[in-house]
């Protein structure tokens, strides 16, 4: 060995083998060093991965699982589920099924699970809660034969729909929540049909949510583009001062910003008082601008406007002013130069802003809840209702899953039409 490397002969030819001071091949030493660097890099970002997993990936996975899980009936009505596996759904089950149901209801009442069972069945077929709880109290005093006593007590036990509901909810994994989320259900024969017209609300809510989110996005583009253009065109000192006004809403509570619109837009509010004072309308013609869809769109536009301005501004700052001057020097009208040269260069910012605003808008909850009234409610409000009041978490998770699917599809369409590589936030 001479110094840090040695010479060796292989196949009759002399080759130079580089080694470290301690005699290890240099290639192996470099590989070990690179491996150590990669391990240290992974350890540095490991807390971030853990945070993303527990705060983002795990909750989404849990929500999706909650939307299809259905263990309650299978766990607490074991005998009934076993009998109904072979039921042909053409006629009311035999005495054996009624006896199994009586045993399961008595056992569920002793374990205090009958209320949960009744609530779950009532979600699927309204009215079954009272049937289950009432029958559970009576069944403990009944003896064979059970079939006549069940039907005599509540006629629902003689209907195929009641037993079909029990059979539909027997599997531990089910899609009934997703069917309910699109106003569908399984009938007695197991076919997918529309639910009663009086209960069809979710498809309309999804359509309203999409339409209002599109309106908010368009309003943000129309208002945000001139603001971003002005900020990008002004000298740095002045644009920084005006940027504070754009960022000011982020420093104000969302609740304060939303309730301020109630003060401004209500029938006895500032805007109506001003129009009456100017003479645009008289006192009897005051306009209802809040607690409806219009109020929701106005309030959400103001709240989400910064999310449109900031991506536009960051892209516009990178467009050289010489582009417009060059187009005008070649004979183009100022507006034509702006439209044909400047605007196409801002499309990455427009796409980023639209994507961001639309995704935020379809999932907004507090603003529609405060200013939406009945006409301005969105699908997020119905998700909150099922989470907090009706406690139908499976349906709430299914509605959230469909909303997530819509966002993923929107992202996919944007990638196909525009290209996600052109998405610029700054």
Residue ranges and their predicted role:
Residues 37, 76-79, 83, 369, ...:
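Interhelical loop and adjacent transmembrane-helix boundary motif
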Residues 313-324, 328, 397-426:
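C-terminal transmembrane helix and the adjacent membrane-cytosol boundary/short C-terminal tail
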Residues 1-43, 62, 66-203:
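Membrane-topology segments of multi-pass transport proteins
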Residues 27-29, 33, 62, 215-247, ...:
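Transmembrane-helix boundary motif in ABC transporter permease subunits
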Residues 27-34, 257-301, 371-374:
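Membrane-interfacial helix termini and adjacent extracytoplasmic/periplasmic loops
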